[in-house]
C-alpha cells in the first residue's frame, strides 16, 4: 500500500505544482493501469491549466482572474480550495492559481482552446495503461477488460485527432 492518493483534479494540481509539465525537459511516466484513463485526464488538464496560469501571469490578468474565481465560489456558497502548508523548497507554485476551477472558466474560449492545443501537443510522457497485464498477470481489474480496452482505444483516437505525438498512451508491460 504505497503511492499518492489522487482523487480529484485539484489533488493532481497539487502533486504536479512547481513542475512545468510542458517544459521541453519534462517527461512524466505513470506506471498505472486500471485507473490510467482518469489519471491521464487529470494529467492533461493540469498541464493545460498550468499553461493557462502562465498566460494569465504573462498578460497581467491575475487580479481579473482572481475576481472571477472568487465570484464562482461566492455564487456556489463554498470556500475556495487552497494549498495548505508550505510549498517545498524550489517549488514556485505553478499550477496552484486555478485550484477549484479550470482555465476554460476564466479565460475567453478562443484563448483557452489555443493554450489547450499547444499544451497537449507539447506535453511529454508515458502512461502504462496495460489492461491486459492487469487482467492476465495480476487479476486486479477495476473495469471489465472489454470496457478498459474500449477506453484505451478512445484515448488513442483522441491522441490521433488532437495530434498528441509526444505522449505515449500505452506501454505494454512484458515482465509480468
Where do the language-model regions lie?
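Catalytic alpha/beta active-site cores
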Residues: 1-176
Amino acid at each position: 500500500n504505497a503511492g499518492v492518493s489522487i482523487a480529484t483534479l485539484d489533488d493532481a494540481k497539487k502533486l504536479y505544482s512547481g513542475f512545468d509539465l510542458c517544459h521541453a525537459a519534462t517527461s512524466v511516466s505513470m506506471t498505472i493501469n486500471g485507473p490510467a484513463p482518469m489519471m491521464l485526464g487529470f494529467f492533461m488538464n493540469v498541464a493545460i491549466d498550468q499553461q493557462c496560469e502562465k498566460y494569465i501571469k504573462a498578460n497581467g490578468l491575475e487580479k481579473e482572474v482572481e475576481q472571477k474565481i472568487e465570484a464562482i465560489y461566492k455564487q456556489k456558497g463554498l470556500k475556495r480550495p487552497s494549498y495548505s502548508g508550505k510549498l517545498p523548497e524550489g517549488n514556485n507554485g505553478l499550477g496552484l492559481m486555478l485550484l477549484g476551477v479550470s482555465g476554460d472558466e476564466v479565460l475567453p474560449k478562443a484563448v483557452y482552446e489555443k493554450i489547450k492545443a499547444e499544451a497537449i501537443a507539447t506535453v511529454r510522457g508515458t502512461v502504462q495503461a496495460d489492461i491486459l497485464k492487469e487482467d492476465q498477470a495480476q487479476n486486479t481489474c477495476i473495469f471489465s477488460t472489454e470496457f478498459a480496452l474500449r477506453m484505451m482505444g478512445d484515448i488513442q483516437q483522441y491522441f490521433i485527432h488532437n495530434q498528441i505525438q509526444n505522449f505515449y498512451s500505452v506501454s505494454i508491460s512484458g515482465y509480468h
